A protein has these predicted regions:
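Short acidic, hydrophobic short linear motifs in intrinsically disordered regions
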Residues: 476-487
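Extended, highly charged
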Residues: 1-253, 257-269, 273-460
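Positively charged, polyanion-binding regions of nucleic-acid-associated proteins
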Residues: 459-477
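Short, cationic-aromatic polyanion-contact patches
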Residues: 459-463, 510-530
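Nucleic-acid-binding small beta-barrel platforms of the OB/S1 family
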Residues: 471-474, 496, 509
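Glycine-centered, phosphate/nucleic-acid-interacting loop/turn motifs that mediate DNA/RNA or nucleotide
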Residues: 506
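Short amphipathic alpha-helical interaction segments
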Residues: 490-501
Length: 530
């Protein structure tokens, strides 16, 4: 996919998924307007600012599929998995339109950028959609999405309280007493955001994963004041350094992906050394929480599937649920071999951010919460099928955890094996189905279809039919409905009377599966011993 950021905006506009607002709008109103809108919003005239703002681009599942050129949400997962397995390294170019205006030194002024506030208790304007690129001299290059709170015209905070590769890079730089250069590319295509949002192993370039998503290399261009690249298609680029202050400065609060207000964090400071942009740059503000949800969810799917593949588990479907903030909860259906319910849980729970996992058989629809709850209700014994792993690395944004400064939190991970237990006959889980469902259709009867009456037998005919039924079930056990079908020339009452006749004569019994058979025959079920 060669589409750039602006072409994506045009496509949203053409399909009615983006609305242009040309009237003056106060920047303080942007977040709530985006929250109320079903479409993305393009604010052409932000009061007091030169540049326009666009927000809410990926606020729905449908727009996330549009962004990655997919017809279904599952296709996004497949596409991302393909990109992870077959990354395409970035292509380096000399310059880009983001160099049309370059501001350095005292010219740097973040207050000239239309950076909105979001939630009512936010600690300040937040840059939310920047693709951040950093390099460690030993560990290689890393990309990710991090927020920056504006503190001064050329100073921000960065939220890297959560354990991740960027935090590791910053920690190593801090311990060496040096700043960590970073580039921040704002206004990139969602492909670059999705690629950089994947938590790749150290040494794997997330921009190469973004290239795999595109099917062609992501173009990167060199910064001016630091030895790092930026995304060439970006609207605005910040060249910066994470200062070696340690995690000592207050940062936040912020309305998080959890749909809750996050607490006050302690984080490093960031010095902005240069701002470059297109002459007519568009400022993209990623709206919380839903844009974060739909952009991040595919990376969770891919990570879970990769972990299960490594464990040798055959996966049918995965649902990273919205109720779990598309982050903490997963329901996974598998084609189970003995013992694999527990193996699947262990593999899935190894994915860092997952907190609660339910594994079900492949007859369960993981996207139907009633089906999943039914599987838990009918297939789980708590003492055998619920697994709790304590003291696992946890996400600091989990509000149920005790919060402590400077401590990477640990918490419990819970797995529920809601697959059919080993040793339980499969027929215990035969679902209710209805006789004649293949031919008796309600629409036909509403349209006037009628059924013909069968033979209504007298006592002699009932006795004769009983003998015929006895001959049939003497050869093989038959379900009651099969008998009614085999002797459909008679009306149902006559068939029922014939079976009653056999019961009175003490000739009728049932096999262990409930089928009708001859009493005392090899098929007959035996009463349990008292």
């Amino acid at each position: 996919m060669q589409e750039n950021f602006r072409q994506f905006l045009d496509r949203l506009r053409q399909t009615g998924e983006l609305v242009d607002l040309h009237q003056p709008v106060d920047i303080r109103h942007i977040a709530t307007l985006v929250d109320q809108a079903d479409t993305a919003l393009y604010f052409h005239n932000v009061v007091g600012y030169e540049l326009p703002v666009v927000s809410g681009l990926i606020r729905t599942r449908e727009r996330s599929m549009m962004a990655l050129g997919c017809e279904t949400y599952r296709e996004i997962e497949d596409k991302l998995t393909q990109a992870i397995n077959h990354p395409i390294p970035p292509k380096y170019v000399k310059t880009s339109p983001a160099r049309e205006v370059v501001l350095v030194g005292d010219e740097v002024d973040l207050y000239k950028l239309p950076i909105p506030m979001s939630s009512i208790f936010d600690g300040g304007p937040m840059i939310t959609a920047g693709v951040v690129i950093a390099r460690d001299p030993e560990l290689g290059i890393n990309s990710g999405i991090y927020r920056f709170i504006v503190k001064e015209k050329s100073l921000t905070g960065i939220d890297i309280v959560t354990p991740n590769n960027m935090r590791l890079f910053a920690q190593r730089a801090y311990e060496s007493g040096r700043a960590l250069p970073i580039s921040i590319s704002i206004g990139t295509h969602p492909i670059e955001i999705t690629g950089s949002g994947y938590r790749a192993p150290l040494g794997v370039d997330e921009m190469a994963i973004a290239g795999g998503l595109r099917g062609s290399p992501v173009e990167l261009a060199p910064c001016t004041t630091i030895d790092l690249p930026y995304v060439a298609d970006a609207e605005i680029v910040l060249e910066a350094e994470i200062l070696p202050t340690g995690w000592t400065w207050p940062e936040g609060r912020f309305g998080e992906f959890t749909r809750l207000m996050g607490g006050l964090h302690w984080n490093p400071l960031v010095r902005i050394k240069a701002i470059s942009r297109r002459k007519d740059a568009i400022y993209y503000n990623l709206h919380m929480p839903w844009e974060n949800t739909w952009l991040a969810a595919p990376t969770r799917y891919a990570a879970i599937r990769q972990a299960l593949r490594t464990a040798g588990v055959q996966v049918k479907d995965i649902n990273v649920t919205l109720g779990g903030c598309a982050f903490w909860h997963a329901v996974i259906s598998i084609k189970k071999q003995p013992g694999e319910g527990k193996n699947a849980l262990l593999a899935a729970l190894s994915v860092m951010d997952l907190k609660h996992v339910v594994v079900v058989d492949d007859d369960i629809d993981v996207f139907d919460p009633t089906e999943v709850e039914w599987a838990i209700a009918t297939r789980v014994q708590g003492d055998k099928d619920v697994m709790v792993v304590g003291n696992a690395r946890a996400k600091p944004l989990d509000p149920s955890l005790p919060q402590g400064y400077g401590v990477v939190p640990t918490g419990a991970k819970v797995g529920i094996d809601a697959t059919i237990p080993e040793g339980i006959p499969r027929e215990y889980y035969e679902r209710i189905t209805y006789a004649y469902a293949d031919r008796a259709k309600i629409a036909d009867y509403i349209d006037g279809k009628s059924d013909e009456a069968g033979i209504a037998g007298d006592d002699i005919e009932v006795a004769s039919l009983a003998n015929k039924i006895l001959g049939a079930i003497g050869k093989e056990p038959l379900y009651y409905t099969d008998i009614a079908e085999r002797f459909a020339a008679y009306d149902f009452r006559t068939v029922a009377r014939a079976l009653g006749h056999l019961h009175v004569a003490e000739k009728l019994w049932q096999d262990p599966r409930g089928r009708m058979c001859v009493r005392g025959s090899e098929f007959a079920a035996k009463p349990p011993r008292r």
